[in-house]
Amino acid sequence: MKAIVYTRYGPPEVLQLQEIPKPDPSDHEVLVKVHATTVTIGDCRMRSFTVPPGQWLFARLYLGIFGPRRPILGMELAGEVEAVGKIVTRFKPGHPVFASTFEANFGGYAEYKCFPENGVLAIKPANLSFGEAAASVEGGITALRC
């Protein structure tokens, strides 16, 4: 599958299109074929390693000391369930979904992404396009949790 990856921090030019292995869902995971994703301020800050001075050490430990620990950015996405693990009951192949990748180690800039069944993943509202659904994830989660 194709993915946009980065192996060092820096300007947008550090992003590269690469061929990587397609993930296989484990027994409790859902494999999503990505139809839409976004570019958030979080993605830009992770890519460039532009963080507030007081958070520098924590950010380096979380994101990667010498280079990105998680090479595929993308904090939100929308797509279609392609496969499910053996014990998954909430989702079926063909379900349209939208999700936050924050708790799933990012990865929205890839053609496929695995999520735990109990992750931040929900059925996409029928009245939203995949692009609209992907763009509503972080704002919607913020509204729900505040």
Regions found by a protein language model. Name each.
Residues 1-2:
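Extreme N-terminal starter segment of soluble prokaryotic enzymes
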Residues 6, 82-83, 114-116:
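Short beta-strand-to-turn element immediately C-terminal to the catalytic PLP-Schiff-base lysine
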Residues 9-10:
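Proline/serine/threonine-rich low-complexity linkers at boundaries of modular beta-sandwich domains
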Residues 17-19, 112:
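Well-ordered beta-strand positions in beta-sheet-rich domains
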Residues 21-38, 50-103:
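Glycine-rich beta-strand-centered segment in the early N-terminal region that forms part
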Residues 42-48:
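Cytochrome P450 core scaffold surrounding the K-helix E-X-X-R motif
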Residues 63-76, 90, 99-146:
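NAD(P)H dinucleotide-binding glycine-rich loop of Rossmann-like/cofactor-binding domains
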